UniProtKB/Swiss-Prot annotation:
Membrane topology: Single-pass membrane protein
UniProt entry tagged with the keyword Metal-binding: no
PTM remark: Tyrosine-phosphorylated on three residues 250, 315 and 322, providing docking sites for host Shc1, p85, and Plcg1, respectively.
UniProt entry keywords in alphabetical sequence: Early protein, Host membrane, Host-virus interaction, Membrane, Oncogene, Phosphoprotein, Transmembrane, Transmembrane helix
Stretches of the chain found on the membrane's Extracellular side: 416-421
Domain J, first and last residues per copy: 12-75
Sites of Phosphotyrosine modification: 250, 315, 322
Role noted for this protein: Plays a role in transformation by modulating the activities of cellular proteins involved in control of cell proliferation and by acting as a functional homolog of an activated tyrosine kinase-associated growth-factor receptor. Recruits upon association with host Ppp2/PP2A the Src tyrosine kinase components Src, Yes and Fyn, thereby activating their kinase activity. Activation of Shc1, Pclg1 and p85 mediate signal transduction pathways leading to cell cycle progression and cell division. MT also plays a role in regulation of early and late gene expression and in viral DNA replication.
Subcellular location, record wording: Host membrane
Subunit details: Interacts with host Ppp2/PP2A A and C subunits; this interaction alters Ppp2/PP2A substrate specificity and localization. Interacts with host Src, Yes1, and Fyn. Interacts with host Shc1, Plcg1 and p85; these interactions lead to cell cycle progression. Interacts with host 14-3-3 proteins.
Modification Phosphoserine occurs at: 257
Gene3D superfamilies per record: DnaJ domain, Small t-antigen, unique domain
Protein name in UniProt: Middle T antigen
Length: 421
């Protein structure tokens, strides 16, 4: 972006767009300002023909120069397609539709931590992989925004605070033409949809009022009240728009409908139920309208069947076997104290706190930590062995030099005595 247009043309374009200088490079806001100024400066609307022509010329040059930034690097080798200027109207959000924010970042906490090595195929991780490929294939030591559209280049250009960086970066990429990102839209992460057979056979029936993810709640979809017909069980690791930061309601938590109350009370007696057929989760979540029971539980022959009486079964005594299997001393499990969120936290910080608390009970993470500890101990032992070998070589060299010095002194004394006699 620093090499797009001259300094005078930059100032003139920003003056015509009526934007501050710090927004230079924000394609979405510049395009929105261009559309507004085009309506004001159009000759049919009473505007100036000269100013309109100058604005169109500078804006067209700006888009062409941004398009050529990565093309001038050469040797990228991973471009999927390159269209002409007529195909630049298709933005990234228009390409992926209403599920753009779900496909933009699969798991915020994991995708933000795995900077160098990630097998994720969301838009955030794919753009980071492009950054490394551009450095390797194009021998580009320093990349700026325009040559690369990854999160790090975005933060380096705009200096965005960490609190809202992912939300602002998602909006920045959403308005960017998909052709400029060199992304294969078929390889981008796409949540799989559940088939109708799996949805009917599932024990937990997801209501049709679960809504979209938190970042889609402020879009034109009715603040997340329109449900997703795919029936995909959404995870709570979702993003959130900056406009929702002032209202700390976690709309990412979903309202589920379960089988009748008596079944739930037998399986989970600690669950709090508010009506006869609907399970209500904890309070900090958006209140969705409830679906009528006749839509949740259609009448069928299986519902009319009476529950069979349970018969008591006799089991063989296996106390001795259990004593052999169980360890002699039980290892105490350290349960970390719950993380209590402070007042005034954004939903994004609340999600991270819940993920951190969940990580203490994740068996995969525990196994990974044990492997890291073993690897660290092996490296420490290897470094100790290497230090001992280096010390042995040093002692051997010192001994050799001392022996050589002694031989030289003996020869010197013998030669001196022979000359004396």
């Amino acid at each position: 972006m620093d090499r797009v247009l001259s300094r005078a043309d930059k100032e003139r374009l920003l003056e015509l767009l009526k934007l501050p200088r710090q927004l230079w490079g924000d394609f979405g806001r510049m395009q929105q300002a261009y559309k507004q100024q085009s309506l004001l400066l159009h000759p049919d609307k009473g505007g100036s023909h000269a100013l309109m022509q100058e604005l169109n010329s500078l804006w067209g040059t700006f888009k062409t120069e941004v398009y050529n930034l990565r093309m001038n690097l050469g040797g990228t080798g991973f471009q999927v397609r390159r269209l002409h200027a007529d195909g630049w109207n298709l933005s990234t959000k228009d390409t992926f539709g209403d599920r753009y924010y779900q496909r933009f970042c699969r798991m915020p906490l994991t995708c933000l931590v795995n900077v160098k090595y990630s097998s994720c195929s969301c838009i955030l991780c794919l753009l980071r992989k492009q950054h490394r490929e551009l450095k390797d294939k194009c021998d580009a030591r320093c990349l700026v925004l325009g040559e690369c559209f990854c999160l790090e280049c975005y933060m380096q250009w705009f200096g965005t605070p960490t609190r809202d960086v992912l939300n602002l970066y998602a909006d920045f990429i959403a308005s960017m033409p998909i052709d400029w990102l060199d992304l294969d839209v078929h390889s981008v992460y796409n949540p799989r949809t559940r088939s109708e057979e799996l949805r009917r056979a599932a024990t937990v029936h997801y209501t049709m009022t679960t809504g979209h993810s938190a970042m889609e709640a402020s879009t034109s979809q009715g603040n997340g009240m329109i449900s997703s017909e795919s029936g995909t069980p959404a995870i709570s690791r979702r993003l959130r728009l900056p406009s929702l930061l002032s209202n700390p309601t976690y709309s990412v938590m979903r309202s589920h409908s379960f089988p009748p109350t008596r079944v739930l009370q037998q399986i989970h007696p600690h669950i709090l139920l508010e009506d006869d057929e609907t399970l209500v989760l904890l309070s900090p979540m958006t209140a969705y309208p409830r679906t009528p029971p006749e839509l949740l539980y259609p009448e069928s022959d299986q519902d009319q069947l009476e529950p069979l009486e349970e018969e008591e079964e006799e089991y063989m005594p296996m106390e001795d076997l259990y004593l052999d299997i169980l360890p002699e001393e039980q290892v105490p499990q350290l349960i970390p104290p719950p993380i209590i969120p402070r007042a005034g936290l954004s939903p994004w910080e609340g999600l991270i706190l819940r993920d951190l608390q969940r990580a203490h009970f994740d068996p995969i993470l525990e196994a990974s930590q044990r492997m890291r500890a073993t690897h660290r101990a092996a490296l420490r032992a290897h470094s100790m062995q290497r230090h001992l070998r280096r010390l042995g070589r040093t002692l051997l060299l010192v001994t050799f030099l001392a022996a050589l010095l002694g031989i030289c002194l003996m020869l010197f004394i013998l030669i001196k005595r022979s000359r004396h006699f």
